[in-house]
Amino acid sequence: MEIKRLTKEELQDFTRLKGCKIENLYYRGDISLLQKPEKIIALIGRRNADADVLRNANRCGKILAESGTVTLNGLAVGCDTAGLEGALAAGGKCIAVMPCGLDYIYPKCNDSL
């Protein structure tokens, strides 16, 4: 895990964060995804979705990854998980926005993602 304290100058380099009032950014993985002008799409949905909806979320994640689109979500169970699993299975890049530090993954079942 890396901890990055952003200066005002550094914040300008993170094009995806412009206008956000952030002092600390905790990350694991490729932080440059926040700097690149790539396509990013939020892939979210119901937590208690049925099997068909989960299959479709997984398929959407895969299609987005294959097109070079970065997927973003909140790492929740259900559609968020299915979409991330589809994107990762296709070799895609993903961003998970979490309300807590990286030392406490919630929900725990998504620790491997």
Each model region followed by its residue ranges:
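Glycine-biased, small-residue-rich flexible motifs in mid-sequence functional cores and linkers
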Residues: 1-113
